[in-house]
């Protein structure tokens, strides 16, 4: 029996769902939780798939599960198969005359806070019957979500070329790093230096994220380091609440606090920045066919930019 024929007879949807979940989540543990499976059961299914394909699809290590080149290639096909099945299912349950358009957006937490409120308001003036699903996630999760078909539109950062395969990127703006505090913070009563700032409790993004890399670069450029007693979180809402209500110093991308700075809810410390800023843009799949709702959402994001 030919190898391709054997593959097509033995491949199952559970193999594709498992593979796509691991690609999206980045670790076997998180993928197992998403699929409500035990990790050994998920590992067994993944091993079966690699035996069927005759290729190693992931490199497993301390950093999680990273797609290999054959894995990247297989992901494109796996997503198309699952998309086709989902589309077929939706077509069977769609009621004639009803608008069932759903637009799925994945955004960096700071981008969601800084960009999306006004965008969503504008969007729903035109698309009152469209369901808008918004998830905040890290940049690797946005890229994986686009490739696996979990989201239609991403608002995030350009990544390494091998991770951008199959994706389009459209620059929106450059985002600088700000150090912000509440209006009556004691630091505002003195000449501020970075070393003095770090004597106060700080809120930063977790290690491995772009905002954290920029925060580390800033403090290291002045011979300092982020204190061990810091708060690490991806939650922009939690970070904002800690900063508004207490004496925390928040290391935050500028887009997330532009309204707070304009209304003086938060104040930026006069600490010199480091670097030119981080490019934030719209991410989509190269082979995507957009619904009218998706296209209107993209247009609303573009129109929200101040240029």
From Swiss-Prot:
<dbReference type="InterPro" id="IPR005119">
    <property type="entry name" value="LysR_subst-bd"/>
</dbReference>
<dbReference type="GO" id="GO:0043565">
    <property type="term" value="F:sequence-specific DNA binding"/>
</dbReference>
<dbReference type="InterPro" id="IPR050950">
    <property type="entry name" value="HTH-type_LysR_regulators"/>
</dbReference>
<dbReference type="GO" id="GO:0003677">
    <property type="term" value="F:DNA binding"/>
</dbReference>
<dbReference type="Pfam" id="PF03466">
    <property type="entry name" value="LysR_substrate"/>
</dbReference>
<feature type="DNA-binding region" description="H-T-H motif">
    <location>
        <begin position="28"/>
        <end position="47"/>
    </location>
</feature>
<feature type="domain" description="HTH lysR-type">
    <location>
        <begin position="11"/>
        <end position="68"/>
    </location>
</feature>
<keyword id="KW-0804">Transcription</keyword>
<dbReference type="InterPro" id="IPR000847">
    <property type="entry name" value="Tscrpt_reg_HTH_LysR"/>
</dbReference>
<dbReference type="Pfam" id="PF00126">
    <property type="entry name" value="HTH_1"/>
</dbReference>
<comment type="similarity">
    <text>Belongs to the LysR transcriptional regulatory family.</text>
</comment>
<dbReference type="GO" id="GO:0003700">
    <property type="term" value="F:DNA-binding transcription factor activity"/>
</dbReference>
<protein>
    <recommendedName>
        <fullName>Uncharacterized HTH-type transcriptional regulator YdcI</fullName>
    </recommendedName>
</protein>
<keyword id="KW-0805">Transcription regulation</keyword>
<dbReference type="InterPro" id="IPR036388">
    <property type="entry name" value="WH-like_DNA-bd_sf"/>
</dbReference>
<dbReference type="GO" id="GO:0005829">
    <property type="term" value="C:cytosol"/>
</dbReference>
<keyword id="KW-0238">DNA-binding</keyword>
<dbReference type="GO" id="GO:0006355">
    <property type="term" value="P:regulation of DNA-templated transcription"/>
</dbReference>
<dbReference type="GO" id="GO:0045892">
    <property type="term" value="P:negative regulation of DNA-templated transcription"/>
</dbReference>
<dbReference type="InterPro" id="IPR036390">
    <property type="entry name" value="WH_DNA-bd_sf"/>
</dbReference>
